Amino acid sequence: MQLLTIGINHHTAPVALRERVAFPLEQIKPALVTFKNVFLGPHAPNAPEAAILSTCNRTELYCATDDRAAREGAIRWLSEYHRIPVDELAPHVYALPQSEAVRHAFRVASGLDSMVLGETQILGQMKDAVRTATEAGALGTYLNQLFQRTFAVAKEVRGTTEIGAQSVSMAAAAVRLAQRIFETVSDQRVLFIGAGEMIELCATHFAAQSPRELVIANRTAERGQRLAERFNGRAMPLSDLPTRMHEFDIIVSCTASTLPIIGLGAVERAVKARRHRPIFMVDLAVPRDIEPEVGKLKDVFLYTVDDLGAIVREGNASRQAAVAQAETIIETRVQNFMQWLDTRSVVPVIRHMHTQADALRRAEVEKAQKLLARGDDPAAVLEALSQALTNKLIHGPTSALNRVNGADRDSLIDLMRGFYQHAPRSNDQSGH
């Protein structure tokens, strides 16, 4: 079995492409089924394995397969599933085989490949991806072991290095940007759209600035109300957004919607109602919640996850010593995992040897039972049984020795000596 990771992320593709390749949560299980069966060889000797990790910053397919053409098949499947031409998608896709796939998984879970260096959210997202793949019946020995090692490495990296210390989060970056637009956040009305983890983090950072008003709009009113109460704010129905958008100076959105929930026309009307006072908007969703054209309006300052990334990277440079330490840990653990993977490669051979040997044994035992049933001498039957087993078991090694020459034969001879040097001696030879 070969490990392979196919994906795009914030390093290789802009948000405009990432949002088109993202998988809504409810689509991941059925997508895994088609991905496994169509492109990872359903009739291969070993059952293929797969997991899909889809976040704001990355979409990745983790595979274990015997299919040597899995790379091309996975890219083609991703293209067809999302209806994106291969020529448009392929230049942004990375394909990581074997140890590169292992190293990548370890780095992602440890926060080394994140826009926010050392952030912990990705670890939870990866665990969610594994849980979903397990529920879909898409995981097996190889990916299960990979992800368990991945989580252990992430824990080791975070526990022994300062990789997560003093990190500038996306939420903190949003506050910094707002402070560039407005003299003080405390005079502004802030609206958060959504009630997930990212909105909760953003609300925490903005609430620390004591805004004039803090409002949560969410599809599920009860969840929005609970979050609003935590920050002494209030909730409003998401359906009120078009008519009340003009009330807010700062709007932060991060929902799981597959289509934009804020369009150009709605924002144009809000700007007009505000008499062209500026609106600061942050779209942390992938796919995006706010139509990109909104950013072209004169009095609107619209930022996406990629825009916030520049601010985040300013805080990453100071922690390069921790990065080097983390990379050393990861490299050691990659080698350990590859050693385990190497041992797995002989398992099918050993299993086949056991099957063949057992078939020989059963055939000879059946012959012996027939001879005993017709009254043959038991001692003679046992002698014939042992001779037949001996001849058949050494037939393979003997044939191999006769087929090779030169250095190959010498190596095989040494190997055979090792096999048989500890063979038990008969009682008369041992003197007992």
From Swiss-Prot:
Keywords for the protein's UniProt record, in alphabetical order: NADP, Oxidoreductase, Porphyrin biosynthesis
Domain of life where this protein originates: Bacteria
Sequence positions that bind NADP(+): G194, A195, G196, E197, M198, I199
Protein's pathway: Porphyrin-containing compound metabolism; protoporphyrin-IX biosynthesis; 5-aminolevulinate from L-glutamyl-tRNA(Glu): step 1/2
Site feature Important for activity, where: H104
EC number(s) on file: 1.2.1.70
Substrates-to-products reaction catalysed: (S)-4-amino-5-oxopentanoate + tRNA(Glu) + NADP(+) = L-glutamyl-tRNA(Glu) + NADPH + H(+)
One Pfam assignment: GlutR_dimer
Binding site for substrate: T55, C56, N57, R58, S114, E119, T120, Q121, Q125
GO MF terms held by the record: glutamyl-tRNA reductase activity; NADP binding
Enzymatic class: oxidoreductase
Record-level GO BP terms: protoporphyrinogen IX biosynthetic process from glutamate
PANTHER family given in the database record: GLUTAMYL-TRNA REDUCTASE
Subunit structure: Homodimer.
Remaining remarks: During catalysis, the active site Cys acts as a nucleophile attacking the alpha-carbonyl group of tRNA-bound glutamate with the formation of a thioester intermediate between enzyme and glutamate, and the concomitant release of tRNA(Glu). The thioester intermediate is finally reduced by direct hydride transfer from NADPH, to form the product GSA.
NCBIfam families: hemA
Annotated domain remarks: Possesses an unusual extended V-shaped dimeric structure with each monomer consisting of three distinct domains arranged along a curved 'spinal' alpha-helix. The N-terminal catalytic domain specifically recognizes the glutamate moiety of the substrate. The second domain is the NADPH-binding domain, and the third C-terminal domain is responsible for dimerization.
Family recorded in the similarity comment: Belongs to the glutamyl-tRNA reductase family.
Protein name, per record: Glutamyl-tRNA reductase
Annotated gene: hemA
